[in-house]
Amino acid sequence: IVMCTPTATPPKWLVDASPDMLAVDSRGALRRFGSRRHYCFSSESYLLQSARITREVAARYGKHAAVAAWQTDNEYDCHDTTLSFSENARVAFRSWLKDKYGDVADLNRAWGAVFWSQEYRSFDEVDPPFQTVTEANPSHRLDYRRFSSDQVVRFNRQQTDIIRELSPGCDILHNFMGVSTSFDHFDIGKDLDAASW
């Protein structure tokens, strides 16, 4: 048996209890419950609940003789779900930028923000690259994709760490989408034993 963590589709009761886990699209519209992959990788409340259910399932089945391997979540980025423009993502992105650049002047230089008067006075002014009148700054968009990829890696790593603790010796894989480019598959792969599609 390959056991899969049940985190790709948070149930309605959990969404109702922690609505901040829902993703937001680039126009600022909430991605509501009713399908799958409706969570935001930057939601700390969902990260906590994902760890909780992963721990419960791995504790219960981790040493069962029939369990040959584990799969984390399912199909990261299916339905264009890596990028979220939620308040959680905004806060996490600002922190990521502070860690990367240290000073907002360095960010402005790296992004060529003088063009079209896009300079920032502090990291607290930087939002995710929401849909704009025309194309947003390409350096801004690239950094947001790198940040978002790091959020997926963090989410996946949390699950692999728990599974390795509670189900030692079992391989861990992820069922990737074939042509997704919104996150770094190789970074995710560092925490896996196999990749599937």
Describe each PLM feature range:
Residues 1-15, 56, 60:
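Hydrophobic or amphipathic alpha-helical targeting/insertion segments
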